[in-house]
A protein has these predicted regions:
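Sec-dependent signal peptide recognition
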Residues: 1-8
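Low-complexity, Pro/Ser/Thr- and charge-rich linker/hinge segments at domain boundaries
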Residues: 17, 21, 166-190, 280-325
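Aromatic (Trp/Tyr) and acidic
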Residues: 29-39, 43-133, 137, 181-182, ...
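Ser/Thr/Pro-rich, low-complexity mucin-like regions
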Residues: 129-168, 270-279, 783-785
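Acidic, glycine-anchored loop motifs typical of Ca2+
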Residues: 409-420
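Carboxylate/His-rich catalytic cores and anion/metal-binding grooves
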Residues: 418-447
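Flexible helix-coil transition and linker loops at the boundaries of alpha-helical arrays
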Residues: 481-482, 530-535
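Solenoid-like repeat scaffolds
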Residues: 567-574
């Protein structure tokens, strides 16, 4: 490896104004026509075109009032015709050199309107444009594109005439990928990458760069802070998933990848990665708390999904009036009912009209409780939301020094608790109020049900199809589901976990005895489990989670006895996916004098086995992101850092095996890198974060409220596996397939993001699947207020 720190050679420095400008997000409506011209490599330049955009409907309009504005549609046939372009270089001597050009392209829709003019063969057919495309035209030149030379690019058929100067230090290149935020100084794994998929032109040939130097440049001074050698990482045929058919050749990039390792560069500062003959990355930072912006952004996303309260500046940069609160929401009085119908008995856990008779028959009367979490872009509550406080509390237990009181600017009255625990308290506090209202009204006997929705009595848009926010949803009945053991075990678990966190933080809750709540709820769930309930989703996981927390909290041997029986078959081959990790992770990380050494050993082996499996994925994938190798490309597989087990493993081994701990920590970091910029789209997967991010997530309140759009802190589902050749309408994740070139089956999975806000499975999210796991990883990495947690 070639290394050189603080060399005297000076590249091009950037002014503070330039650095700020290139890290600002693009305004809306966006620029159309030729958006930018960037070099891909020594022989290829990319022209990026945008046809137009969508003017979206507003509150009080119908969704079909969207309007597609095509200001500068590209003639793609003309753009790829032989001799469509000429590229002439102006060398230093002043002489002109014309190069032979071959044009290739990729195109996709990146803005979609929500309408269906006609319905033919079970598909929407529109008589007007229903999307706006973006195009990337790759001009392959037989003569090399030299650093420092000026190039004149002309296409008479496109009425295009532009000039550009390329150089490795000053010219941005989308082929150079970095974490757009940056890296910790003590990171054991700082990597940038060189790769590109060029549509029908194949992929960038990285082999000529292997062994050649790269440079990490101090952004303002232009001083070369580090030089290393480009190394080949993996080929385009390298498998990156066990799931066949999700992406061509089981590779999410369809590109050869080379990497640039600058792990030993630890000096804080602002830098860019420069590769001669290609160009440079955007400016990034090396800073101890570099992940804090990502953590705070995602936590604002969690806050934004609180129901029942008014959200407004200075806590959030928008105004959403209080929804679904019988006391605060005008017109919602007497609209929330309790039904004895358990959601776990229904034919569909979302909603089905087949279940409506049972829901109606079970209604016992009104409820006044408010303040659950909205699930996603819609407004319902699910038992899976138990994962939100669990995940936030686990993040705190993993790295308590990383979190403080006041940093998230929450609307809650200050208590001295770290803000992450204040947010974690939100749902248990709602469960407490729900449980005690059910008892006081004689509706219930001590349990709760967490499926709360209005789906059985109307749609989100109302009877007239008029767009509205959650605070305007007042013309239908909402129901809270009947007491069930799954929801109640979940509540018992987070109540006990919260008590443990209060104890660890040296605080107490003056208004709720969480230990008592946990034990009473656990006992109710155990006594009210019906035949078959134990086979419902999350039943065993929440029961295990509750047992773990209650044993740590109380030391009661009955909980340990149950745990020992339930974990008798645990081994290093046990895999703890999703909510299966909850109890074991908390058992290992919580501070408690009651830990059973046998249980610690069992949980440790299972967690480390799971972490090793997640980390093996990072080793095998070119861009080093971890997770479940067998997870299909859906619900956030390409957007969300699901590596909690690796984070736990890093802490569990910190004293016993520091080398292993550092490896685990590095895998969490490189996973975060992927979701914060090293991905093929060169964007973060958090709305509002960084210069490039998801612009149009499916989130109805943000479409209609006043303030910043899109809402900050949303991590969408993102790229989704193809399920049909043709989507049925704009709400279908396959609707965008018709907008792409080459055909969708040739598109690498990681580039199948179309910014289709009409499609829940592409643009939506859930707080439990996407936001909370992201908050855990970025919070774990963000470093303490005094760089605590430094490794």
């Amino acid at each position: 490896m070639i290394t050189a720190l603080c060399l005297s050679f000076v590249f091009q420095g950037l002014t503070p104004e330039q650095i700020k400008a290139e890290n600002l997000p693009e305004p809306y409506p966006p620029k159309t026509g030729l958006v930018d011209t960037r070099r891909v490599d020594r022989h290829t330049v990319c022209l990026h075109f945008r046809d137009g955009y969508v003017l979206y409907h507003h509150a009080g309009q119908k969704r079909s009032d969207d309007t597609v504005v095509l200001k500068s549609p590209l003639d793609v046939a003309a753009a790829t015709a032989p001799m469509a372009f000429s590229v002439t270089s102006i060398v230093r001597s002043g002489a002109l050199k014309e190069t032979t050009v071959v044009a290739t392209r990729k195109s996709k829709g990146t803005a979609f309107a929500w309408y269906a003019d006609k319905w033919i063969d079970n598909h929407a057919v529109n008589d007007r444009p229903d999307s706006a495309q973006e195009h990337w035209i790759y001009l392959h030149c037989n003569l090399g594109l030299q650093d420092g030379a000026a190039y004149h690019i002309v296409s008479p058929s496109l009425h295009l005439d532009t000039s550009v100067v390329f150089d490795a230090a000053g010219s941005l290149s989308d082929s150079v990928h970095v974490n757009l935020l940056g890296y910790r100084p003590d990171s054991p794994a700082k990597f940038g990458y060189l790769y590109a998929w060029e549509g029908d032109g194949g992929c960038l040939d990285v082999k000529p760069y292997v062994g050649q130097p790269f440079h990490v440049i101090e952004a303002q001074s232009g001083v070369n802070a580090f030089t290393g050698a480009v190394q080949f990482r993996a080929g385009k045929s390298n498998p990156e998933t066990a799931v066949a058919g999700d992406t061509p050749g089981s590779n999410f990039l369809s590109a050869d990848v080379a990497d640039c390792d600058f792990s030993s560069l630890a000096e804080p500062g602002r830098y860019y990665l420069s590769i001669p003959g290609v160009g440079r990355s955007r400016v990034f930072e090396i800073r101890a708390d570099i992940y804090r912006a990502a953590f705070r952004s995602v936590m604002m996303g969690v806050l934004g999904n609180r129901s029942g309260i008014d959200l407004a500046p200075p806590h959030v940069p928008y105004h959403r009036p209080a929804p679904h609160n019988t006391a605060l929401t005008p017109g919602f009085a007497a609209k929330l009912k309790y039904t004895t119908s358990r959601y776990i008995d229904r034919t569909n856990f979302d909603s089905s009209l087949a279940d409506k008779p049972a829901v109606e028959a079970g209604i016992k009367g009104d409820l006044s409780v408010a303040g659950w979490y909205q699930d996603a872009g819609d407004w319902d509550s699910y038992e899976s939301h138990i994962q939100v406080p669990e995940t936030l509390m686990l993040a705190y237990m993993l790295a308590p020094a990383n979190f403080s009181s006041g940093e998230l600017n929450l609307p809650d009255a200050p208590t001295g608790l770290p803000d992450i625990l204040t947010e974690a308290r939100w749902l248990p506090a709602f469960c407490y109020r729900l449980r005690h209202e059910l008892l006081s009204r004689n509706y219930g006997t001590g349990g709760i049900g967490l499926r709360i929705c209005g789906d059985y009595f109307g749609d989100d848009t109302g009877p007239n199809g008029i767009a509205r926010g959650s605070w305007q949803d007042t013309d239908r009945i909402w129901t809270a589901s009947g007491e069930d053991p799954v929801s109640t075990y979940g509540y018992a678990a987070v109540a006990a976990n919260l008590a443990l966190c209060y104890r660890q933080a040296g605080k107490r809750d003056p208004s709720v005895d969480w230990a008592r709540e946990a034990e009473e709820s656990y006992d109710w769930a155990a006594k009210n489990t019906k035949a078959g309930d134990e086979n419902k989703p999350d039943f065993k996981e929440y029961q295990m989670y509750a047992l773990c927390c209650l044993h740590l909290l109380t030391g009661d041997q009955r909980f340990a006895t149950e745990l020992l029986a339930e974990t008798a078959d645990y081994s290093p081959s046990t895999r703890l996916w999703w909510s299966q990790l909850d109890g074991p992770a908390v058992y290992l990380m919580a501070q408690s004098k009651f830990k059973d050494p046998v249980l610690v050993g069992r949980f440790r082996s299972a967690v480390l086995g799971t972490a090793d499996a997640e980390m093996e994925s990072a080793h095998r994938r070119a861009l080093r992101w971890g997770g479940d190798w067998g997870m299909p490309m859906l619900v956030g597989q390409q957007t969300t850092p699901w590596v909690a087990a690796i984070a736990v493993a890093s802490q569990v081994t910190k004293t016993s095996d520091p080398t292993a701990s550092r490896r685990y920590f590095g895998a969490v970091e490189t996973t975060a890198d992927y979701f914060l910029g090293t991905n093929p789209l060169n964007q973060t997967w958090v709305s509002g974060l960084g210069p490039e991010f998801p612009r149009d997530p499916f989130h109805m309140d943000s479409w209609y409220e006043e303030g910043v759009y899109p809402r900050p802190g949303i991590v969408p589902y993102g790229p989704w596996r193809k399920e049909h050749d043709q989507g049925s309408g704009p709400w279908d994740q396959d609707w965008a397939n018709k907008s792409v070139y080459p055909p969708i089956d040739q598109w690498p999975g990681a580039e199948r993001w179309f910014n289709n806000r009409c499609s829940p499975l592409n643009g939506e999210f859930t707080i439990s699947q996407n936001l909370a796991p992201s908050a855990l990883v970025y919070g774990f990495l963000c470093g303490g207020s005094q760089t605590a947690g430094s490794r």
